[in-house]
């Protein structure tokens, strides 16, 4: 059954979200139209504002409405000479939620993927290299995802950093806290054994 053009357009637009198929998009559209038009209007307003006003931080490339994000603009960050390299702005939020890192970030907005046309320029690596060349960075922590592409990206950045007298490390990978060994994949187990620590 076909709906009105505006309802169809709303359903099609909602399908652009990750993990949202036709049925989920239809349920969301009907929820907003049938039960919560005020929330729908609020969503439309917030989405419109974000699409027009949110850009990328000129220093770290995370999302912000300003020239610099709050982290890069802060003079209270303890380890401003330490940069943690992540793939997405969501990774910044995850690390910040842990509260164990007080340095700055550099957001790649992806990972190296030559088959998809994503090379060093698309990841902003020339900006990262400019940070390293400034002499203000003492350590680079690579927190890319533990995937083939994430590993390749980390190795590329580590090689790039070699000429700048910067300490480079990679976050540890292994068995998650609260995880049970029988459910852990073999690659993660291998990383856990290779990265074991003395007690």
From Swiss-Prot:
Keywords: DNA damage, DNA recombination, DNA repair, Metal-binding, Zinc, Zinc-finger. Pfam families: RecR_C, RecR_HhH, RecR_ZnF, Toprim_4. InterPro entries: DNA_Rcmb_RecR (IPR000093), Rcmb_RecR (IPR023627), Rcmb_RecR_Znf (IPR015967), TOPRIM_dom (IPR006171), TOPRIM_RecR (IPR034137). The keyword Lipid biosynthesis does not apply. GO terms for molecular function: DNA binding; zinc ion binding. Disulfide bonds: none annotated. The keyword Zinc-finger applies. Residues 81-176 form the Toprim domain. GO terms for biological process: DNA recombination; DNA repair. It comes from the Bacteria. A zinc finger (C4-type) spans 57-72. Belongs to the RecR family. HAMAP family: RecR. May play a role in DNA repair. It seems to be involved in an RecBC-independent recombinational process of DNA repair. It may act with RecF and RecO. This is Recombination protein RecR. It comes from Shewanella woodyi (strain ATCC 51908 / MS32).
